[in-house]
Amino acid sequence: MNLQMIGTGNAFAKKYFNNNALIEQDGFKLLIDCGITAPLALYELGIGMEELDAVLVTHTHGDHVGGLEEYGFQMKFKHGRRPVLLLPEALVDPLWQNTLSGGMTQEGLEKLEDAFDVRALRVGDVQELAPNLCVELVPTSHIAGKKSYSLILNRDVFYSADMTFEPELLTTLVRDRGIRRILHEVQLEGPGAVHTTLDELLSLPEEMQSIIKLMHYADNKEQFVGRTGKMEFLEQGLVYPI
């Protein structure tokens, strides 16, 4: 399984695209989140949106879903098909009603299922997306009153959505679930009201830090190189075997 971060930036980053990830397994391409910058990020990597086999949404903030309108329109009007959209069942209605309907509603496009081949995912299920690729939702805390879901990929890789610090969850995943790699969002400075701070992650045991890769960072990331303990930054555009 290969990981390519088409973007590694937080919602306000300008040097980096939105934190969205391309997972490829045996030719199957899964995009985790499709933020505002995703269409341009894919273009600059030479990847057409029509090459994606599915998009999976973790939560409904713009840096994670803001590119879905263009994706849906491109696929409908240029390629004549509804693309596969995977998302937690609790997000199906809010994604359309609160985010996409204003820009996408027109004759023949009156609900999410008109634009996308919607595949609702349930918490607790391990969903096989393709041969040798499965995903499990993990509810995690981000914004009060807004649901957000991190992911377990192929049973042993934890991919964090935007989330506050949950050390007990991370410990349980590693100790009891056999997680061998953690791809974790990070807020480099300030208090972690809705994100996990670097200082919080540095409080983890070094053994756990050594399996963590950092993403969703700010434009001043270069100032923190060498200051992340045993953790390393994921770099935008590079392909990592995971």
From Swiss-Prot:
Chain positions recorded as Zn(2+) 1 binding sites: 63-64, 162, 216
Pfam family, one: Anti-Pycsar_Apyc1
Known cofactor(s): Zn(2+)
Record text on cofactor binding: Coordinates 2 Zn(2+) ions. One protomer coordinates the metal ions and the opposing protomer provides the catalytic residues required for cCMP hydrolysis.
Keywords, ordered alphabetically: Hydrolase, Metal-binding, Zinc
Molecular function (Gene Ontology), one example: hydrolase activity
Region of interest called Beta-lactamase-like, as start-end residue ranges on this chain: 17-216
Catalytic reaction annotation: 3',5'-cyclic CMP + H2O = CMP + H(+); 3',5'-cyclic UMP + H2O = UMP + H(+)
The family this protein is said to belong to: Belongs to the anti-Pycsar protein Apyc1 family.
Anything else known: This homolog of an antiviral immune evasion nuclease may be due to cryptic prophages, or it may play a role in regulating the endogenous antiviral defense system based on cyclic nucleotides.
Complex formation: Homodimer.
Identification of the protein by name: Anti-Pycsar protein Apyc1
